[in-house]
Amino acid sequence: MVGLDHIALIVSKEENLSFYEKLGFREVKRIERSYDTVVFMEDNGVIIEVFIDPNHPARVSNPEALGLRHIAFVVEDLSKVDVECEEIRTDWFGRRFTFTKDPDGQPIELKEKNTPEDGEKNR
């Protein structure tokens, strides 16, 4: 493997894109299809492919099913994130992090960017 290309998400409505915009993502391409809309969003080389489709079933949350548990994005400063989050904690590597959910309930981890003195401690 040489890298991660993108993360694909399904959202129920167009307005939910604003959640990802608050995290810094910007729309770079939109494809309108007869059965859904696909929006590519990018921030610092991270691409999310967002499928807007109100007809998908809701996410099963408890108990968690096998498969993807959550996605994690790195942010510059957790105190400046403009979405409602859980209490900020420290992970096993000493980095600050928190969790939030997008409007459709997709769990999102937000992790504060390493500082130069952190070095490689969370790679």
Language-model segments: which ranges?
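A short, acidic/glycine-rich surface segment
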Residues: 36, 55-61, 117-119
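Short, conserved structural micro-motifs that define repeat-unit consensus positions
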Residues: 6-8, 40, 70-72, 95-99, ...
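Vicinal oxygen chelate
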Residues: 82-123
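Core segments of cupin and vicinal oxygen chelate
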Residues: 9-48
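Short, charged/polar, Gly/Pro-enriched secondary-structure boundary elements
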Residues: 45-49, 105-108
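N-terminal beta-strand motif that seeds the catalytic metal site of vicinal oxygen chelate
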Residues: 1-15, 69-71, 118-123
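Mid-chain, well-packed structural core segment of small domains
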Residues: 63-87
